């Protein structure tokens, strides 16, 4: 059994019931551990509530997943990095899996009302790719497993989204940006030797990875191509 649920759905009674079932993974819709963000999003819990639930589940030896979001009202990149640090500190040697989702504006929601009133500005696809790529890189460095970046495409989702970074390849581009951060972090100016398995990650989507590497390193696209060798 594998399931995803709201962090407030766990009490001692529920935890006791779970012992009777072969649960392989419990995922929590954490969204954020920034209390201001949680309050603005009306999530109905505080960061301390999430931490308590995760610690209880890990103590019972469950595999736990945390679903984090980017681009929420009043959220910053720094707060998401702080979320990762907090999760790393409470997970210890236990396995904790992450999903990273962008905030999208759906029809007939409170967020749509904020958008129409000019009180919320969704992320662009480019900013969402960069933000989630940074989160991915930091999460990997902290030892997390990343199960997914971006939402699974469904007809109902496609028909409901009215604004925000909705792109079927958001995850692939975010991982490409994460790779670029790793490459330039180890060697800012190259030349770089890159595994062949990453060719599509760099060259896909109109050379998104190559262009990102050029942007970060300050070299032209042609100079970047000359500095890369695939092994």
Model-derived features: where do they sit?
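Short secondary-structure boundary segments
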Residues: 30, 102, 194-196
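Conserved non-cysteine loop/helix-boundary elements of the Radical SAM core domain that shape
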Residues: 1-61, 65, 69-100, 107-126
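Generic structural motif
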Residues: 6-8, 103, 197, 224
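Histidine- and/or cysteine-centered catalytic micro-motif in compact active-site loops
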Residues: 101-103, 151-152
């Amino acid at each position: 059994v594998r399931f995803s649920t709201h962090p407030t759905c766990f009490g001692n009674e529920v935890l006791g019931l779970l012992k009777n079932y072969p649960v392989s993974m419990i995922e929590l819709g954490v969204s954020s551990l920034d209390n201001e963000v949680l309050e603005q999003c009306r999530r109905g819990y505080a960061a301390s509530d999430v931490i308590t639930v995760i610690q209880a589940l890990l103590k019972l030896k469950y595999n736990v997943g945390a679903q984090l979001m980017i681009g929420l009202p009043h959220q910053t990149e720094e707060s998401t990095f702080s979320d990762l640090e907090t999760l790393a500190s409470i997970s210890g040697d236990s396995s904790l899996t992450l999903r990273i989702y962008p905030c999208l504006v759906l029809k007939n929601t409170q967020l749509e009302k904020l958008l129409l009133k000019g009180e919320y500005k969704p992320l662009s696809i480019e900013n969402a790719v960069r933000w989630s790529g940074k989160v991915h890189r930091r999460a990997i460095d902290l030892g997390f497993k990343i199960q997914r970046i971006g939402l699974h495409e469904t007809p109902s989702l496609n028909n409901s989204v009215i604004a925000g970074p909705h792109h079927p390849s958001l995850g692939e581009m975010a991982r490409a940006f994460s790779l670029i951060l790793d490459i330039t972090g180890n060697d800012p100016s190259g030349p770089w030797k890159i595994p062949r398995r990453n060719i599509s990650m760099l060259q896909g989507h109109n050379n998104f990875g190559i262009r990102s590497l050029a942007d970060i390193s300050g070299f032209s696209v042609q100079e970047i191509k000359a500095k890369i060798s695939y092994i």
